[in-house]
Amino acid sequence: MKTLFDTKELLNEFDINLIGIDEAGRGALAGPMMMAACKLNKQLDGLCDSKKLSEKKREELYEIIIKNSNYLILAFSSEQIDALGLSTCLKKGLKLIKKHFKTENNFLYDGNTNLGINGIKTQIKADTSILQVSAASILAKVSKDRVMNFLAKDFPCYEFEKNKAYGTKAHKEFIAKFGICKLHRKSFKLL
């Protein structure tokens, strides 16, 4: 089992023991932030950063990933984010992921900081080059989008099914017109 990451080696070799981690909804103005961790059982084709895939393709890959991996998806509500802060939620998520997979290392988190959690390596844009992180990216993004599509039915004036609660021009205009709802993150600058 590898415990230290050599990115060039990982790009050329599929590591079945690697657990990729990513999140979706970190910068959204409303709704949950989803964190996902994924340990693929085999190499899968078509995986890349979820933001580079169509919604239809993400949904297709989501179903393939969950059938071919050990994974964990966590949700942090807007209330938790407001009460604890993003960094604390992310730290809590990383700790829960380590506990779930019952290993101390061989984790790769997309980004530039492991928030002080030992055994978790980081790499900027890992979701574009490491299959397990791409898979985690897809799991997190699809989960976040599904939640926002569901919640959109109760809050139609914000069009969450379209903007997924991100700070688009239209979403900010809806906040200015209708005010915030209980899903909005009050600790964020919303306008």
Swiss-Prot record:
It catalyses: Endonucleolytic cleavage to 5'-phosphomonoester. It is found in: Cytoplasm. This is Ribonuclease HII. Keywords: Cytoplasm, Endonuclease, Hydrolase, Manganese, Metal-binding, Nuclease. Endonuclease that specifically degrades the RNA of RNA-DNA hybrids. One of its GO terms (molecular function) is manganese ion binding. Manganese or magnesium. Binds 1 divalent metal ion per monomer in the absence of substrate. May bind a second metal ion after substrate binding. The gene is rnhB. The keyword Hydrolase applies. It comes from Campylobacter jejuni subsp. jejuni serotype O:2 (strain ATCC 700819 / NCTC 11168). It holds the Pfam family RNase_HII. Residues 16-191 form the RNase H type-2 domain. Belongs to the RNase HII family.
